[in-house]
């Protein structure tokens, strides 16, 4: 079963639906309605997805604690706020984006042969809803960049993968209607298949 941590985002159940389409059961819990103890002893997930949300990682309930507790035990995927939370949990700094992107489609790169991008083209369009990003200068060395986009001719991190553990983050929204359903579902399916 996959645990989907809901950061009070309207797209959370789009993610849940994509997970269900793979045949994997999903349990959705709000970021302030569970505990590490409950996750370990009662829920016992095989993987964890951390949803988008309207706040910062500091305001995302249990998310950073979950990442710190489970990163070396279970595969984790963070989407948007979840991606930022992964960066921050490992020491990255979350900063205001130079360009705010709410409901905008951008071209993403597919770099470094990430398992979650397996079967995707080298460039694909995806939807962005964010005003925060991981500062590239602060990206912990334990991560590699698996996706970028360009804003004002500057690279913006759109995807990261831990070098030693199956921990992934995507800043864009694979579950948004503005992202090709084929590509969005493929990312979720690839993660579920790990």
What residues fall within each predicted segment?
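Amide-donor transfer/coupling interface in amidating biosynthetic enzymes
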Residues: 2-4, 11, 17, 28-43, ...
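The conserved beta1-alpha1 loop
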Residues: 5-6, 51
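Alpha-helical hinge/cap motifs
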Residues: 6-9, 82
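A short, Lys/Arg-enriched amphipathic alpha-helix followed by its capping loop at the start of a domain
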Residues: 18-24
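Short, Asp-centered acidic motifs that coordinate Mg2+ and/or phosphate
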Residues: 46-47
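Short glycine-rich anion-binding loops that position phosphate/pyrophosphate groups of nucleotides
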Residues: 52-56, 82-84, 175
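Gly/Ala-rich beta-loop-alpha elbow adjacent to hydrolase catalytic centers
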Residues: 63, 78, 82, 87
């Amino acid at each position: 079963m996959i645990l989907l941590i809901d950061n009070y985002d309207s797209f959370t159940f789009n993610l849940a639906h994509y997970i269900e389409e793979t045949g994997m059961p999903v349990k959705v819990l709000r970021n302030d309605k569970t505990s590490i103890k409950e996750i370990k002893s009662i829920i016992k997930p095989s993987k964890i997805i951390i949803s988008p949300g309207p706040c910062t990682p500091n305001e995302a309930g249990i998310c950073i604690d979950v990442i710190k507790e489970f990163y070396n035990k279970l595969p984790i995927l963070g989407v948007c706020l979840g991606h930022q939370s992964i960066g921050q949990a490992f020491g990255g700094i979350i900063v205001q984006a130079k360009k705010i992107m709410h409901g905008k489609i951008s071209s993403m790169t597919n770099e470094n042969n990430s398992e979650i991008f397996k079967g995707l083209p080298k460039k694909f369009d995806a939807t962005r809803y964010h005003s925060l990003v991981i500062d590239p200068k602060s990206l912990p060395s334990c991560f590699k960049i698996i996706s970028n986009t360009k804003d004002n001719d500057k690279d913006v991190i759109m995807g990261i993968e831990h070098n030693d553990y199956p921990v992934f983050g995507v800043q864009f929204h694979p579950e948004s209607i503005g992202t090709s359903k084929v590509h969005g579902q493929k990312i979720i399916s690839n993660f579920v298949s790990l």
